[in-house]
């Protein structure tokens, strides 16, 4: 699948431009000795908004990771967006991870729902239910329900979602972005087999989170 997005996310272009102008102005006035922290900030902002293409596994029953980060939960939990018991897998993104979100499965969106909330540390469990979040509920062609939830964090305070109910999604398709550290929860049907463990480093689209029961 082609990834029709620039390697530096458009969401970051204004921040990069501002950081570059500040660094250039301070360098022009005070030289590199004064400007180096601002050049360093520019490098950080550029790396934060990187958005590389990733290989997408072809395995038909695979649930792909929706974001880069580290696994912080693999457990049975209530999926409040689809009213069911589910297998929940949570990915925590720190400020050094890629922050775009990509669809874990092929399917059609049955619901997109936004919830205002707090901005707790996204690595802790109660962030799933108390923080600002946006849920995308996807129905696969085989009738399976997969819920992907963008969750704001302590630093991240802007969730961007570019899809609506009724639209199709393809596995690996970019559908959202969260700025500056956050979390994504994925809820799967009971009977799905987790393929990751807590503490594991994962990558959007290329890591298989789980396998749906066939």
Swiss-Prot record:
EC code(s) of this entry: 4.1.1.65
Organism: Burkholderia cenocepacia (strain ATCC BAA-245 / DSM 16553 / LMG 16656 / NCTC 13227 / J2315 / CF5610)
Manner of cofactor binding, per the entry note: Binds 1 pyruvoyl group covalently per subunit.
Biochemical pathway: Phospholipid metabolism; phosphatidylethanolamine biosynthesis; phosphatidylethanolamine from CDP-diacylglycerol: step 2/2
Entry keyword set: Cell membrane, Decarboxylase, Lipid biosynthesis, Lipid metabolism, Lyase, Membrane, Phospholipid biosynthesis, Phospholipid metabolism, Pyruvate, Zymogen
In-chain residues carrying the UniProt-annotated modification Pyruvic acid (Ser): 182
Single GO MF annotation: phosphatidylserine decarboxylase activity
Site (Cleavage (non-hydrolytic)): 181-182
Protein name: Phosphatidylserine decarboxylase proenzyme
Catalytic residues of the enzyme: 182 (schiff-base intermediate with substrate)
Primary gene name: psd
Function recorded in the entry: Catalyzes the formation of phosphatidylethanolamine (PtdEtn) from phosphatidylserine (PtdSer).
Pfam families, sorted: PS_Dcarbxylase
């Amino acid at each position: 699948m082609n990834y029709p997005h620039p390697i530096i996310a458009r969401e970051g272009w204004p921040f990069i431009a501002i950081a570059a102008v500040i660094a250039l102005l301070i360098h022009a006035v005070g030289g590199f000795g004064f400007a180096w922290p601002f050049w360093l900030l520019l490098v950080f902002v550029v790396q934060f908004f990187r958005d590389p293409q990733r290989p997408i596994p072809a395995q038909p029953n695979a649930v792909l990771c929706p974001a880069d980060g580290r696994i912080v939960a693999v457990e049975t939990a209530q999926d409040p967006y689809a009213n069911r018991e589910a297998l929940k897998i949570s990915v925590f993104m720190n400020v050094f991870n890629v922050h775009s979100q990509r669809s874990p499965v092929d399917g059609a969106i049955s619901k997109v729902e936004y919830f205002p909330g707090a901005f707790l540390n996204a690595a802790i469990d109660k962030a799933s239910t108390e923080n600002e979040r946006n849920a995308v509920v996807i129905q696969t062609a085989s009738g399976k329900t997969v819920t992907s939830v963008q969750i704001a964090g302590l630093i991240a305070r802007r969730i961007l979602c570019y899809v609506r109910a009724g639209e199709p999604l393809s596995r690996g398709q970019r559908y959202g972005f969260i700025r500056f550290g956050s979390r994504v929860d994925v809820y799967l049907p009971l009977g799905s087999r987790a393929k990751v463990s807590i503490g594991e480093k994962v990558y959007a689209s290329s890591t298989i989170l789980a396998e749906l029961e066939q």
